[in-house]
Amino acid sequence: MQEQYRPEEIESKVQLHWDEKRTFEVTEDESKEKYYCLSMLPYPSGRLHMGHVRNYTIGDVIARYQRMLGKNVLQPIGWDAFGLPAEGAAVKNNTAPAPWTYDNIAYMKNQLKMLGFGYDWSRELATCTPEYYRWEQKFFTELYKKGLVYKKTSAVNWCPNDQTVLANEQVIDGCCWRCDSKVERKEIPQWFIKITAYADELLSDLDKLDHWPDTVKTMQRNWIGRSEGVEITFDVKGYDNTLTVYTTRPDTFMGATYLAVAAGHPLAQKAAANNPELAVFIDECRNTKVAEAEMATMEKKGVDTGFKAIHPLTGEEIPVWAANFVLMEYGTGAVMAVPGHDQRDYEFATKYGLTIKPVILAADGSAPDLSTQALTEKGVLFNSGEFDGLAFEAAFNAIADKLAAKGVGERKVNYRLRDWGVSRQRYWGAPIPMVTLEDGTVIPTPEDQLPVILPEDVVMDGITSPIKADPAWAKTTVNGTPAMRETDTFDTFMESSWYYARYTCPQYQEGMLDSKAANYWLPVDIYIGGIEHAIMHLLYFRFFHKLMRDAGMVTSDEPAKQLLCQGMVLADAFYYVGENGERNWVSPVDAIVERDEKGRIVKAKDAAGHELVYTGMSKMSKSKNNGIDPQVMVERYGADTVRLFMMFASPADMTLEWQESGVEGANRFIKRVWKLVYEHTAKGSVAALNVDTLNDDQKALRRDVHKTIAKVTDDIGRRQTFNTAIAAIMELMNKLAKAPQDSEQDRALMQEALLAVVRMLNPFTPHVCFTLWQALEGEGDIDNAPWPVADDKAMVEESTLIVVQVNGKVRGKITVPVNATEEQVRERAGQEHLVAKYLDGVTVRKVIYVPGKLLNLVVG
């Protein structure tokens, strides 16, 4: 081997070897335990960023480790290739989304290879190809036939700039999450998949996911939002229909003093015909933000419709208001208000001078003080006629039973979860496989016309989808009858909901999945990605798996056994204020900084001399110009260094602070390992290790080697604390660097230690370890080498450290054989000069001995 570590030479050579040998290509093998390691597939935006590198390095470390345990490891990669950014980029660069996307895929594929990730490239897929989305289209038509797909007109969040529908989660402060345009409300027909039909199972099966983060499970539980309550029907004077409301607190029903309906409710619309104030209010609501997170904080407004509802138990008339906090698409579009015991209802009633009637006693049994806020806790009823004196559960049941007996109420389980709207009014997505016949009948595209192929050779005007702008594209015939194709495309969450299953059989032509292959590999053993996907992608991913199970394609109930959410990557952020007061963000690479003695940044400027404001560490982003290009770092230090730093700088699930000094430290460590192997191998061949003839120092060093193997194995395999595993290897390396190399057995022990170190580092730094393994004459390629196994015998301590106290004060420490008797320990303590001086001329009155730990001599 050469004396100097030159990553630029060895990395490309090793990568070529992997490519030629197809090292990471796998097939189903019933004789081996399988392990499916998956990182969330990237969107081909053009370049990898450090967030990608962190995600994929964690996955690669786990995959390589599991492979060394002898498992059949699948680690695939592909491209989540449909989506809006491609349309914007195509318009900007005067091209079409397809060529832009395919160019990006080619570029990013090279970047992934440059980082040395051990992917099975034979399974690579891009979700924008008809070979992929044809099966999704076919599956959609099958779901339609099962009654799990329907079309309805619904109020949507419409981004006028992107000309598309946004999910509630994509509306932030009333604006589009992507382009910041003001969002409008619009009624359009859309396709939905009935995820609500699986709400109960999606909820209960969370309990099976023992190895998913609790935070993600809690977010999904809250998102599904199961509640038990009562649906109550009110008659309304002068209105032909009844109003139905749902409540989880029927115990407070006797305190209901008004009803509130959504601005879009038919009752409000009817009242608005003779009420100009209400008509203006309805119009205002139509264009108001409705992202659920904002509902709680926005100002509550309403207008009295003039209608009166009849309380079904008291017969009292209560007013019906139109209010902006009631949504037509949630529940029935109407709610009952109990201002004495619900804070939102209380604020609204206070604002508009509506009746507030308390019906629950305070905890001390007194009437509640409602002068400043509602009493929202459960308690004992009063002011409720025949139900007075009942506590929550008894009151819930008594009132629910009474309403049911009168035929105006029924118990019901409700969900916050809404059906999944999958229509998008965009071009760059999979066409929805439905057609409309001349008589208006809507049917699935016949199987012999699938896939419905998206034309790729298009001209983008930045406004209208090319398939909407081209009337010829939509024209088709079904059984000789003219028909029109659906011109909406699927939400891109459709593609990312089942890709993990297609990886198990990407070339399969007979259907969506080859069940034999899918059931061999699934469920995924570990899925790695950001926590920002907790409710959308990860819920659809679980839902789709259950749909495929019920279609007979897979047998497991859940798609992934373990979920690991990696932390964000942070970097320093700097800006200077421009002439017009605007902030100009400067890359940390271009900042010249001064630090204090603790390493904190105290001053910064850029090459042009601008004084920079340092805003601290924040998530790498384009907006703050603080992203670090992985390619530049790989060219400067090598892929192994970047990978090692990524895994060492922070626990995998915590934020990682990008520090170039830390990268340099990782690079120095690799050079130290290289140097030690070089010096060791330069001395020529090595004799066999004879563990029976080792002296005490050699035994101690060998003990350290095997204790490190045990720790690293536990840290990577069970605890997944990769940073502590690396720290343990570094600590061992420090000891090995100081170990004498004088005798045959010294060198034989060094050979055993280095073969272990190189294998333990292999998942982190595979290129350098591949090379060092060859230099050490390890058997075969390191990619097929077994993980080192700790020798229990070597780890047995032959001596132990005893703390010696005189009258309870520590006076010394002694090393004794593990099997030493109390007499031998006392004798050895008396010989220790630090202890002996306290025993001079005194009598030992009592001895307290804790075997293997402590000797306390009481003297007087």
UniProtKB/Swiss-Prot annotation:
Catalytic activity: tRNA(Leu) + L-leucine + ATP = L-leucyl-tRNA(Leu) + AMP + diphosphate
Superkingdom of source: Bacteria
Positions that bind ATP: K622
Gene3D superfamilies: 2.20.28.290, 3.10.20.590, HUPs, Isoleucyl-tRNA Synthetase, Domain 1, Valyl/Leucyl/Isoleucyl-tRNA synthetase, editing domain
UniProtKB keywords: Aminoacyl-tRNA synthetase, ATP-binding, Cytoplasm, Ligase, Nucleotide-binding, Protein biosynthesis
An annotated Gene Ontology molecular function: ATP binding
InterPro entries, alphabetized: aa-tRNA-synth_I_CS, aa-tRNA-synth_Ia, Leu-tRNA-ligase, Leu_tRNA-synth_edit, M/V/L/I-tRNA-synth_anticd-bd, Methionyl/Leucyl_tRNA_Synth, Rossmann-like_a/b/a_fold, tRNAsynth_Ia_anticodon-bd
Residue interval(s) of motif 'HIGH' region: 42-52
EC number(s) per entry: 6.1.1.4
Main location: cytoplasm
Keyword Cytoplasm on entry: yes
Entry's family note: Belongs to the class-I aminoacyl-tRNA synthetase family.
Official protein name in the record: Leucine--tRNA ligase
Organism: Salmonella arizonae (strain ATCC BAA-731 / CDC346-86 / RSK2980)
